[in-house]
């Protein structure tokens, strides 16, 4: 059996373009799908998949680890987030092929189920771009949060951390604490609330913001500082009593290693569409388990990524909770028919072989590539300096 072709399919979903990767074989009707969606880098990911494809064509698709090693090590230049997103998409598709070939869901190939169902959380608006990133007032915040809870979720993530300079006055801190307090009052103690800092703050302000909301018990505070500085992250973790999460912008187990060695967080968040794929994420999770850290994978991406996330979550012992954005666009399930089922804030296992999805390429082509809305280019300090989005 050999890989005969690799091609990409780009689907614009407003907030981001989904980059689907199809790996075809010489066996009639046997192919697999993966996803490497990366905001504002769509054409680069498509290009890197095209560049990597010759290293895979002609290989036996069942030799997944061998192909990964070839792509990662024989490219000579170590791959960053663009290259690793390309590898991730190809690697996922190989698992889809192998599951179909053996007639089992991918999670059965990863050691089988360690849990009966997978807890989910979503964002304001269920992933609607403007609700997620443009809700900074109490009224809309409460309305959108209650709608999410009404849809069965028991956990929600919010992104209302102020855009911040290295130091800010008391006004932003008080406003942030008020929002979290009103949200906790509205949803009650039975709902977990995660706060995504989006890497917007330096340690001094991150610590002040977190201390201001500790009494409302966030489930975790995510990426309180930009991802480049492990020591800064450790400073935050040691200064607060709220669990700290990070990792969505790290790729490969080697970038996670300093986080583990310095115990710089409590929860890691690899993105299976960027970190190197399913097996690399399993290795990262195993490292985290050694350090008694939980795993809450990053996944605001497309429907292929959802299927990948389900397989990972069902088979990973230290998994905590799974991010989703299932209502980002109304036609999501027209493009990808999925065996994914939800119930009371949980994903349920599928018995469909492979990843359990079918991509409708005709429907997908109704939503061709468009340049994504670039929120980040408008974020400025009072003096006009650029801030982290």
Predicted regions located by residue number:
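Metal- or metallocofactor-binding catalytic centers and their adjacent structured scaffolds
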Residues: 26-102, 388
């Amino acid at each position: 059996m050999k890989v005969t072709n690799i091609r990409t399919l780009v689907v614009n979903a407003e907030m981001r373009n989904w980059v689907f990767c199809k790996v075809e074989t010489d066996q009639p009707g046997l192919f697999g799908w993966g996803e490497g969606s990366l905001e504002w880098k769509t054409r680069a990911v498509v290009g890197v998949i095209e560049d990597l494809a010759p290293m895979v064509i002609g290989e036996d698709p069942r030799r997944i680890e061998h192909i990964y090693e070839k792509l990662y090590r024989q490219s000579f230049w170590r791959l960053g987030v663009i290259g690793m997103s390309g590898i991730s998409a190809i690697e996922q598709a190989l698992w889809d092929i192998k599951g179909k070939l053996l007639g089992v869901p991918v999670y059965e190939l990863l050691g089988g189920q360690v849990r009966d169902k997978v807890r989910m959380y979503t964002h304001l608006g269920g992933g609607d771009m403007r609700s997620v990133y443009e809700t900074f007032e109490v009224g809309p915040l409460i309305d959108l949060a209650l709608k999410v809870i009404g849809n069965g979720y028991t956990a929600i993530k919010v992104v209302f951390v102020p855009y911040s300079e290295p130091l800010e006055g008391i006004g932003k801190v008080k406003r942030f604490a008020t929002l979290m307090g009103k949200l906790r009052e509205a949803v009650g103690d039975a709902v977990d609330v995660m706060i995504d800092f989006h890497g917007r703050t330096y340690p001094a302000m991150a610590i002040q913001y977190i201390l201001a909301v500790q009494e409302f018990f966030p489930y975790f505070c995510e990426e309180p500082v930009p991802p480049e500085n492990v020591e800064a992250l450790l400073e935050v973790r040691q200064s607060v009593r709220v669990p700290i999460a990070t990792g969505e912008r790290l790729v490969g187990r080697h970038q996670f290693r300093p986080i583990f060695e310095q115990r710089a967080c409590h929860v890691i968040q690899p993105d299976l569409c960027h970190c190197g794929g399913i097996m690399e994420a399993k290795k990262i999770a195993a490292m985290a388990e050694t350090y008694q850290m939980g795993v809450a994978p990053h996944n605001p991406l497309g429907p292929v990524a959802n299927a990948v996330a389900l397989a990972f979550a069902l088979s990973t012992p230290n998994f905590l909770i799974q991010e989703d954005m299932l209502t980002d666009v109304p036609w999501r399930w027209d493009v990808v028919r999925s065996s994914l089922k939800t119930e009371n804030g949980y994903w349920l296992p599928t018995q469909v072989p492979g990843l359990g999805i079918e991509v409708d390429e005709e429907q997908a082509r109704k939503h061709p590539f468009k340049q994504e809305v670039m929120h980040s280019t408008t974020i400025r300090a009072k003096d006009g300096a650029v801030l982290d989005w």
